């Protein structure tokens, strides 16, 4: 990354000094390529600041799925810096072009060294490498026929227990290393002695952000979306509806399932995930706001952890009093990167000299979790309840990354069960293995779930398999878990709701619906905040698939080169039959467009 920056600066100086009389076209071309390369490098630096790992699955997912509910305050300065840098880049580009005249242009091609440095600056740009690796991973065709999915029935063969999941935002096992972080998490360190602690839990691909970690640990699958086909999933009504998750299994057994989170449920689709998978009550910031003592006591992400854990403990007491099996899942927030936040109740308890903000936050949350667990473990609720303390994912780039990145990093995973003997288990495992392992403690015969395995009785698939290859071998099956709605179940467009209804399913529009050979839904594409117009996606369709496109009339007319009058807010539907080389454009309210109309249109010979 820094090598590329050095080469960019060096190539600018050398190219600037290598000007000679030559082709004005070549001058423009080399100038454009140079400044494009510089622009993409600046974008990479910003993405790296967000993720700590360059352009990865988490960055792509949030660009695709959406960022509503995003705690944006801590990113204002770096984002402003990105904008300023690119304004300067654009200004330099304009000035550079302005000075290129027919009498003073391009570099002397005999001066090989400037060209070499310039090419090296392009080839070393990590933006291209990360993007290529992601696209290659998502589009590669692996000829592996083995099905690693565990799909046998999971049922109770022992007495049912309640279950509590406490996801600790970006708190990983590495923070427990006393040689590196002495006395950083003394409470959780002490609690570990009373738990079944798994010390060797890795993060496979597509699991290292919050909703991905939740899907992996509860469903045993990575959070893949059809990125190669630019499918955002942001407008789909159900989140991995065909995945079999802990919530689905417990819901069938009449468990009362609840999720309490301090942030906006819309962020990354967390609320949709829990509602899809059997949870009766799903609450985030807006649902909890009116129950808070002080509505102004919140971080940029939502409810502070001291307030959240107090709400969770009271909810556990309430659920326990109802004499019905329950599952309660929650996620803390204070340790969110890059610097974390400090709850008022432990604001005076800084770590060491207090100069590292994220470590202060981790130290504070350790205190809050310790207080919660001290109350829970001596209560009657613990008699028939299994509690899980775990990472949602490894820490992203924060004020301690320079220390964390030098270590062998693992996820936190501890199970507290009064009927089980405390011990430490160093078996190789990954986030997929968490779900089936936990379920075995609450009475289920869970040998596996998805790509996960019960680490108490089985070896993780990580032991004998390359996980990237394993995920790719099951990619089609994983993508099918999104289960697009079917036209045969009905088709109705509501302009008022900006939705397309397929029976009891729906998607948002604008949308591009690509059909398969049976003229059923194969893919659905959306326009994420108008960042990539659907017209571009239509143009890039490589096959002769039929499709429906619902969008503003102006965009459809422009694509089809139609000169028609329309109101600025009018929406149209384009039906394009690429096999018969014909199309039809209609205002949404011009005809009764239903599933029969679509079926008849595309069945026309």
What does each model-identified segment do?
Residues 1-134, 601-605:
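Transmembrane and membrane-interface helices of multi-pass
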Residues 12, 17-20, 265-268, 420-605:
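Membrane-interface soluble catalytic domains
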Residues 51-61, 85-86, 90, 114, ...:
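Active-site-proximal alpha/beta segments of enzymes that process anionic O-linked groups
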Residues 212-223, 403-446:
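Substrate-binding rim/cap in mid-to-C-terminal beta-strand-loop elements of soluble/periplasmic
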Residues 215-218, 275, 331-338, 388-398, ...:
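Acidic helix/loop microenvironments that form the catalytic cleft of cell-wall polysaccharide enzymes
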Residues 248, 310, 363, 367-371, ...:
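Feature representing long, continuous alpha-helical segments
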Residues 341-347, 359-382, 410-413:
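Active-site neighborhood of glycoside hydrolase catalytic domains
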Residues 364-403, 438-445:
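Metal-dependent active-site segment of extracytoplasmic phospho-/sulfohydrolases and closely related
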């Amino acid at each position: 990354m820094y090598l590329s920056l050095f080469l960019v600066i060096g190539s600018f100086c050398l190219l600037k000094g290598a000007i000679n009389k030559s082709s004005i076209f070549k001058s423009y071309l080399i100038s454009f390529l140079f400044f494009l390369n510089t622009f993409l490098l600046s974008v990479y630096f910003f993405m790296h600041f967000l993720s700590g790992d360059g352009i990865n699955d988490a960055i792509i997912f949030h660009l695709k799925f959406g960022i509503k509910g995003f705690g944006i305050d801590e990113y204002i300065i770096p984002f402003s810096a990105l904008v300023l840098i690119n304004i300067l880049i654009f200004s330099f580009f304009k000035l550079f072009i302005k000075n290129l005249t027919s009498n003073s242009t391009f570099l002397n091609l005999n001066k090989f060294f400037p060209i070499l440095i310039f090419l090296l600056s392009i080839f070393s740009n990590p933006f291209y490498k990360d993007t290529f690796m992601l696209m290659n991973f998502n589009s590669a065709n692996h000829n592996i026929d083995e099905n690693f999915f565990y799909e046998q029935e999971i049922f109770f063969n022992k007495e049912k227990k309640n279950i509590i999941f406490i996801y600790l935002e970006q708190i990983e096992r590495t923070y427990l290393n006393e040689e590196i972080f002495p006395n950083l998490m003394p409470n959780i360190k002490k609690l570990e002695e009373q738990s079944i602690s798994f010390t060797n839990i890795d993060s496979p691909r597509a699991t290292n952000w919050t909703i991905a970690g939740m899907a992996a640990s509860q469903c045993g699958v990575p959070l893949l979306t059809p990125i190669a086909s630019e499918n955002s999933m942001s407008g789909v009504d159900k989140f991995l509806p065909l995945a079999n998750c802990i919530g689905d299994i417990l819901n069938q057994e009449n468990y009362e399932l609840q999720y309490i989170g301090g942030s906006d449920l819309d962020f990354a689709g967390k609320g949709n995930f829990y509602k899809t998978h059997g949870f009766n009550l799903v609450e985030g910031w807006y649902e909890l706001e009116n129950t808070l003592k002080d509505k102004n006591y919140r971080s940029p992400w939502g409810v502070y952890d001291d307030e959240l854990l107090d709400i969770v403990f009271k909810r556990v007491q309430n659920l326990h009093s109802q004499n019905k099996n329950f599952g309660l899942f929650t996620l803390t927030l204070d340790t969110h990167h890059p610097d974390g936040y400090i709850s008022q109740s432990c604001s005076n308890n800084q770590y060491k000299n207090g100069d590292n903000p994220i470590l202060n936050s981790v130290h504070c949350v350790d205190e809050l979790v310790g207080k919660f667990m001290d109350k829970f473990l001596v209560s009657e609720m613990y008699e028939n309840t299994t509690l899980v303390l775990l990472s949602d994912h490894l820490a992203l780039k924060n004020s301690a990354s320079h220390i964390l990145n030098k270590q062998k990093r693992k996820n936190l995973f501890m199970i507290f069960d009064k009927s089980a003997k405390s011990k430490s288990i160093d078996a190789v495992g990954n986030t997929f293995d968490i779900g089936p392992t936990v379920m075995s403690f609450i009475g289920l015969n869970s040998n596996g779930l998805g790509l996960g395995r019960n680490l108490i009785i089985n070896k993780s698939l990580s032991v004998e398999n390359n996980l990237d290859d394993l995920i790719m071998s099951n990619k089609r099956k994983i993508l099918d878990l999104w289960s697009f709605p079917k036209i045969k179940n009905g088709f109705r467009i509501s302009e008022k709701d900006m939705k397309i209804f397929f029976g009891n399913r729906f998607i948002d529009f604008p949308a591009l619906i690509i059909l398969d050979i049976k003229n059923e839904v194969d893919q659905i594409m959306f326009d994420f905040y108008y960042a990539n117009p659907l017209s571009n996606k239509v143009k890039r369709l490589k096959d002769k698939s039929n499709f429906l496109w619902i969008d503003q009339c102006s965009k459809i007319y422009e694509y089809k080169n139609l000169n028609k009058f329309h109101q600025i807010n009018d929406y149209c539907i384009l039906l394009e039959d690429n096999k018969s080389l014909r199309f039809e454009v209609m205002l949404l309210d011009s005809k009764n467009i239903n599933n029969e109309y679509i079926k008849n249109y595309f069945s026309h010979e």
